[in-house]
Amino acid sequence: MPMPTGGEWPPREHAPAYQAYREWHAWYVGEPDLLTEVYTNRRDMPFTPRVRPSQYAGGIFGRAARWLWGTPPRADSRDPRLHIPAPADLARVSADLLFAEPPTLALPKDKQATTDPAAPKPAAASPVEQRLADLSDEIPCLLLEGAEVAAALGGTYLRVTVDRELSPDRAFLTRVDADGALPRYRHGRLIEVTFWTLLEIDGQRHLRLLEHHTPGRIEYGLFDGTDMELGRRIPLSEHRDAEYLAQLVDGDAGQSTGVEQLAVVPWPNIGPQRRWRTVPHQRHLGRSDFDGIEPLFDALDRVWSSWMWDIQAGKGRILVPDVYLESNGSGRGASWDAEKEIYAGLNMLPKPGGENNMITIAQFGIRVQEHRETCDAIWREILRAPRYSEQTFGEQGDGAGPVTATEIGANERVSFTTRDRKAMLARQVIMDAVELLMAVEQAQNLPAGRGVEPLRPDVTFGDSVSPDPLTTAQTAQALKAASAASTRTLVEMVHPNWDQTEIDEEVELIEAEVAATMPPLEDPGAFRADA
């Protein structure tokens, strides 16, 4: 698929995915106006919002009005609909389970130095070890944000970026979300992708920057079109956000990456793809955590809005006779002064069988229990689809201080299973991205790549909950008593965040302390049989 040259935008073959991205983006953002726009304009492509009268009356063309957000509010009344940010919570928790504690990058086992205590220790870290340490500090925020958006949209992409003006000594990873990419796969592998960015909207005019990635090469194009059309290609120098590229590209508006593969790594949220399993261009995309539960999001908002309406309608009100009202002047109506002590005589009879009270109190009931139970039931179904535990969202109360693994491990087994599935994909993505970044740095002769041999690092994910120190200590004690683990293994278990140097020093201290407590050995030559 070469660089697009015009026509519909996004291209027709990507329409199913982009319609879904539009909906998932609206739920993720949680803006009521955006949700109303999406569900009052159900089409394959985004376009200018409009309101159809049939949406107010129902009917065939008003099917979307069955959604809470599919019926526009009346222009002469306050919008009673409220949104609960459950979709945003799902995406955030998904990312927190993976990357709340940053992953660590280390040399593969076959590349690590020997752990023989008698072997000489290296004076300093090797260049590749130092580069991995730097990346461990550089990428955690990128991964955390990427995982959150991937949970909402079904995936994201990591690309290796070289900008010698911003970062003269090294390349860095950047992220492109699924709704800014047009990928092409073969046998489940990404073979090319076009990233696009909307640079400017001026009335009907839309300026888009396209970035087409193929193995070893990136081509750029600036297009002047509309919201529905890509339009004509114009020079990169015609927009301030693209003019810097004009100094980098060759005669074909592209540049070489220096490596033979794509400078992009796709990052699917989870698989398999259910919605587009038989659609050629979308079958290899990741699956969103929102997929299939959009009606439940809408139902939760409907029940919550109904609850709030009950509160509004349940406000205490009073009905007073006309004689209690005082005129506010010609054409300005009348009002009642609740602080007034003396009123004129009443030209009315008291209520039959009631007290001689001319004020009637109106107070409607508020269905608290019914609404709460319905919201809870819908919330449980929302969590069931992407496979999360209620305890992960603090549904049983939050205790003071960090929660230990012993306290919540059994209750959150479902969430941990989902985390492990996502971690399998994320681990491969990180390994591929780091190796690709090192290869680009070496090919581009950047200072950070000198002396660094590209490799796939070992990636270790942090614990999503705090390990229980007592349980860890008891486990280590049992292993030691059973002679089932070495001192080094026990130190690594108790201190999983320590590096190799810290572990070596601790092992030496323990062995020295153990040796100091041992009784001295007797000299065998001093033994006498007749003693």
Residue ranges and their predicted role:
Residues 244-410, 447, 460:
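Extended, charged amphipathic alpha-helical segments
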Residues 144-285:
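Extended, regular secondary-structure scaffolds
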Residues 1-201, 521-531:
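Extended, helix-rich architectural segments
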Residues 432-459, 504:
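A glycine-biased, small/acidic residue-tolerant capping/turn segment at secondary-structure junctions
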Residues 44, 48-51, 349-385, 402-428, ...:
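Extended, non-catalytic structural segments that build the interaction scaffolds
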